[in-house]
Regions:
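Low-complexity, highly charged intrinsically disordered N-terminal segments
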Residues: 53-97, 108-110
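Canonical phosphoinositide-binding patch of PH/PH-like domains
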Residues: 45, 232-295
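Extended, Lys/Arg-enriched charged tracts that mediate electrostatic binding to polyanionic substrates
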Residues: 184-194, 198-201
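Alpha-helical transmembrane spans
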Residues: 82-180, 300-358
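Short aromatic-glycine-enriched beta-strand elements
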Residues: 224-230
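Long, charge-dense tracts
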Residues: 2-5, 9, 112, 353
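Phosphoinositide-dependent membrane-docking surfaces
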Residues: 194-195, 202-222
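Short, non-transmembrane cytosolic segments of multipass membrane proteins
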Residues: 9-72
Length: 358
C-alpha cells in the first residue's frame, strides 16, 4: 500500500479560507500593467473547461495501464498536485529528436541534392542551362519527397529506431530523466498548506499558500492577447508564471477557473474540485468522501464519460458557459482584511520551519 492509498489528516498549517490568520502588510506594492490581482477565499465552484477535456482523455488513457493510479508519473492526488517549474523536461527531449530528423531530411537533403547536381555538372562538363534545369527539377522534387516520407520515418525513429539505439543505455537514461524531472518538480500540498517550487539543483522555494498573490497575466503573442495564471510571493515579490501548471490560454475565464479550482484544492474545508485527475483519490480525502456520500456522486463519472457527447452537451452548455458567464468581479477577498494586523517580526516566528526567509 502506498501513501496515496491512505486517508489523511490535515495539518494545522493547512489552508482554510474561513480561518485566515493575521498577516503583515507587504513592504513592496506591486503595480504592473497587464496584471490583474485576484481575490482569495471566495469561490465560483467552477472547473476549467478546456483543461477538463484534456484531463478526461489523460485519465481514461492512463487507467488502461495503471488502473490504481499508483504510478509515480501520475502527479495529481488528494495530497498534492505536482508540476514542473521552468524545466524544459521530457517534452523537449521528445521534440528535439523528430525536429532534428525532419530538418536534416528536408534542408540537408535539398543541400545534398544541389551539391550533387553541381558536382555531376562539373564532372561531365554539362552546360549551365542543363545543370540549372536538373537543379530546378531535383531540388523541389526532393523537398516534396522529404515531406512525404517525413511522417513514416519519424514514427519509425521514435518507436523503433531510437529504442533500438538507446536500449543498452535504458537504465542510465531513465535514471537521469527521473532525476531531471524530480529536480524540477514542484507541488501544491493540500495536507500542510505549503507551496514548494523547485529552483533546480535540489533547491526549493517553500512558503504557505496564503502568502501567494494570484494574478491573471496578459501575454501578447502573434495572433492576439492571451492569458496565464501567475503566482507572486506577497513579501519578496518572487514571480512564478512559467510552470507546467499555468499554461497560456486564449480565454481569460479559463485562467480564472483554474485559480478557483486551485484555491478549493488547497482549502481543506472544501471537498476536492470535481476534476478528472483527482477522481481516483476522492474517497481518500475525508472532506471529499463525506461530500460525495451526501450527494451520491458517481465515483467513476469522469473515467466512464463519453467525452464527445459531453462536449456537445453538458460540457459546453453547463461547464464552459458557467465559467464564461460567472460574475467574476463580484468576488470578495478574505485575505485583504487580515493584512497589517501583525508585525513582520511576530509573523516570522509563526511561519512553518523550512519556509523561505522573508
Amino acid at each position: 500500500m502506498t501513501d496515496t492509498d491512505v486517508k489523511i489528516d490535515f495539518e494545522s498549517t493547512a489552508f482554510r479560507a474561513v480561518m485566515i490568520e493575521p498577516l503583515p502588510s507587504s513592504p513592496k506594492k506591486r503595480t504592473w500593467i497587464g496584471e490583474e490581482l485576484q481575490p482569495m477565499g471566495t469561490y465560483a465552484g467552477v472547473i476549467p473547461y478546456y483543461a477538463t477535456v484534456q484531463d478526461v482523455e489523460a485519465i481514461q488513457d492512463h487507467e488502461k495501464s495503471d488502473s490504481g493510479f499508483s504510478d509515480k508519473d501520475w502527479w495529481w492526488n488528494h495530497q498534492r498536485i505536482r508540476f514542473l517549474n521552468g524545466k524544459i523536461g521530457l517534452k523537449f527531449l521528445i521534440f528535439v529528436v523528430p525536429f532534428t530528423w525532419i530538418l536534416t531530411l528536408v534542408i540537408g537533403g535539398m543541400a545534398t541534392v544541389g551539391w550533387g547536381v553541381l558536382s555531376v555538372g562539373r564532372h561531365y562538363d554539362l552546360s549551365g542551362i542543363l545543370v540549372g534545369g536538373l537543379g530546378f527539377i531535383l531540388v523541389p522534387g526532393w523537398m516534396l519527397f522529404a515531406f512525404w516520407i517525413a511522417r513514416p520515418t519519424t514514427n519509425w525513429i521514435m518507436s523503433t529506431g531510437i529504442g533500438f539505439i538507446l536500449k543498452p543505455f535504458e537504465k542510465t537514461i531513465n535514471k537521469r530523466l527521473d532525476a531531471t524531472l524530480e529536480d524540477g518538480c514542484s507541488e501544491f500540498n493540500r495536507v500542510d498548506g505549503q507551496v514548494r517550487i523547485a529552483l533546480g539543483r535540489g533547491r526549493y522555494f517553500e512558503a504557505p499558500f496564503v502568502e501567494f498573490d494570484a494574478y491573471v497575466e496578459r501575454v501578447v503573442q502573434h495572433g492576439g492577447i492571451f492569458y496565464r495564471l501567475m503566482l507572486v510571493h506577497h513579501y519578496i515579490q518572487k514571480t512564478f508564471n512559467k510552470t507546467g501548471f499555468s499554461t497560456i490560454e486564449s480565454e481569460k475565464s479559463e485562467v480564472l477557473a483554474l485559480w478557483d479550482m486551485l484555491q478549493r484544492y488547497m482549502d481543506v474545508t472544501q471537498p476536492l474540485p470535481d476534476t478528472p485527475r483527482l477522481e481516483p483519490f476522492r474517497h481518500l480525502d475525508p472532506v471529499t468522501a463525506e461530500h460525495d456520500r451526501k450527494t451520491g456522486r458517481n465515483p467513476r463519472y469522469w473515467r466512464d464519460l463519453d467525452l464527445e457527447s459531453w462536449k456537445d452537451g453538458e460540457g459546453w452548455t453547463e461547464v464552459h458557459q458557467r465559467q464564461s458567464r460567472f460574475p467574476w468581479g463580484s468576488r470578495t477577498c478574505k485575505l485583504t482584511p487580515q493584512l497589517g494586523k501583525i508585525s513582520m517580526e511576530e509573523y516570522r516566528k509563526l511561519r512553518p520551519p523550512g519556509a523561505w526567509p522573508i
